[in-house]
Design a protein with these regions (language model features):
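Extended, low-polarity transmembrane helix blocks
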Residues: 2-150, 154-377
C-alpha cells in the first residue's frame, strides 16, 4: 500500500471512528438534557432561535470562503489534520447548544475551574470572562457554539493553503480564548493536574494541530514530523513529571480510584461505559500501591521513545491515551455538561497523525531506495 492509499484509508477510518464515537453520546446527552434539565420554554426557544440564525450565517460564511479559494493552490499539510480539526470543532459547537449551557456552563464548568486555581491574580483575570458571559448568556452561548460550527465546517470544505491559513488563525485565537477562560489554562494552575485527567487541555491540542497551517516551514513533511514528535514528547514528559509531584496527591492511596469514581454517577452515563468504570474503580481501590509509579514510567517511556523515533513509543502512547480517555476522562462528553471530548481524544488523534506522517516518510524512503537500486543496475 503506497502513502496516498494509506492516507485515504486513514481518513476514511477516522471519519467513521469519530462518527461512531460521537453520534451515540451526543444523542444520549441531548435526550437526558431535555428530559431532566428544566428551562422555561420561552427561554429555550429564544436560545435555539439565536443558535439557528448564527449557525446558518457561519455555515454560509464557510461555503463562501470555500468558493472564493477553490482555485488556489492546495495545502501540502496531510488531509487528516484538516478532517480531525473540522469534526472536533463541529462536535464542540453542537455540545455548546445543550439546553443547560447558557447558565450551566458557568456554574458547572467555569466556576469549579476558577475555584480550583491557587492564584488570586489568575482567578481575578478569569472572572472577567465569567462576568461578561453572565451579561447575555443566551447570546454568548449561541455565538460560541456557532463560531465553532463555522470553524469546523470551514476546515471540512476548504483545502487551499490561503483559506486554511485564515481559518487556522481564527481557530487558534478562539481555542486560546477557550483554553484560558473555559479550561482555566488547561488546569495548569490547579493542584492535582495530570495527563490522566486532562492536562494540558483539549483547546491547546487544537492550537497545536492548527499551527502547521500558518507556518510555511511545516509544509515540509520532515519538518512536520519533527514538530509533532517534539510536541507529543514534551506533553508526555511533562505529564510524567506532574504525575510524581507529591503535592498533586497521586501518591495518596485511593486518589486514582477516586478520579474514576467521580465519573461513575454522571447523569446520562452509557451503561457499557458505566460498567467499565465501575469494575476499574473496584480493581484500583485495592491494588493501587504501585500504580502511580507505573503511570509515571509509562509516560516517560512513551515520551522518550517517541523522541528517539522508536515506534514502540507511539504504540505505548496510543494505548495509554485511549485507556485514560475512557477511564479517567469518561470520554469527556459524558462528564455533564459536556463541552468537548476532553484532552484524551485530540491527543490520541494527534498520535494517529504522527503515525501517518511516519508511514509516509518511510514509504518515500523505500520508494527512493528502490528507484536508486534500479538505476544502478
Amino acid at each position: 500500500m503506497n502513502g496516498s492509499k494509506f492516507g485515504k484509508s486513514i481518513n476514511g477510518l477516522l471519519v467513521l471512528f469519530l462518527f461512531l464515537v460521537f453520534i451515540i453520546p451526543v444523542v444520549t446527552i441531548f435526550f437526558f438534557d431535555l428530559r431532566f434539565y428544566y428551562i422555561p420554554e420561552n427561554e429555550i426557544s429564544k436560545f435555539y432561535i439565536y443558535s439557528l440564525i448564527y449557525s446558518t450565517l457561519g455555515i454560509l460564511a464557510a461555503i463562501i470562503i470555500a468558493r472564493m479559494f477553490r482555485k488556489e493552490e492546495r495545502s501540502k499539510i496531510p488531509n487528516t489534520i484538516r478532517l480531525i480539526l473540522g469534526i472536533l470543532w463541529i462536535v464542540d459547537g453542537i455540545l455548546q447548544f445543550q439546553p443547560e449551557m447558557p447558565y450551566g456552563f458557568l456554574s458547572v464548568v467555569i466556576e469549579p475551574s476558577i475555584q480550583a486555581i491557587n492564584n488570586v491574580g489568575v482567578e481575578k483575570f478569569l472572572m472577567i470572562g465569567y462576568n461578561i458571559w453572565l451579561l447575555h448568556p443566551f447570546q454568548f452561548d449561541a455565538l460560541s457554539g456557532s463560531l465553532q460550527i463555522f470553524i469546523g465546517v470551514a476546515y471540512l470544505l476548504n483545502r487551499s493553503t490561503k483559506a486554511l491559513n485564515y481559518i487556522s488563525f481564527i481557530s487558534i485565537i478562539w481555542a486560546l480564548v477557550i483554553w484560558i477562560f473555559g479550561e482555566g489554562l488547561g488546569g495548569i494552575p490547579e493542584s492535582g493536574v495530570s495527563l490522566l485527567t486532562g492536562f494540558p487541555g483539549s483547546a491547546l491540542i487544537y492550537i497545536i494541530l492548527a499551527v502547521p497551517y500558518i507556518s510555511p516551514k511545516l509544509g515540509n513533511i520532515k519538518n512536520l514530523q519533527k514538530y509533532f514528535t517534539y510536541t507529543v514528547s514534551a506533553i508526555f514528559l511533562i505529564g510524567g513529571i506532574l504525575q510524581i509531584i507529591p503535592g498533586n496527591t497521586f501518591w495518596t492511596k485511593g486518589q486514582l480510584a477516586y478520579d474514576i469514581y467521580m465519573n461513575i454517577n454522571q447523569q446520562g452515563e452509557n451503561p457499557i461505559v458505566y460498567a467499565i468504570l465501575n469494575h476499574t474503580y473496584v480493581y484500583l481501590l485495592f491494588r493501587e500501591n504501585y500504580l502511580n509509579i507505573f503511570m509515571f514510567l509509562l509516560m516517560i517511556a512513551s515520551g522518550l521513545f517517541i523522541l528517539l523515533h522508536i515506534r514502540t513509543g507511539l504504540i505505548l502512547a496510543t494505548v495509554f491515551v485511549g485507556l485514560t480517555w475512557l477511564l479517567f476522562q469518561d470520554m469527556g462528553i459524558y462528564i455533564l455538561p459536556a463541552t468537548d471530548p476532553n484532552t484524551g481524544l485530540p491527543l490520541l488523534l494527534m498520535l494517529v497523525i504522527l503515525i501517518e506522517i511516519d508511514f509516509q516518510i518511510s514509504s518515500k524512503r523505500i520508494i527512493k531506495g528502490a528507484a536508486q537500486g534500479v538505476s544502478v543496475t
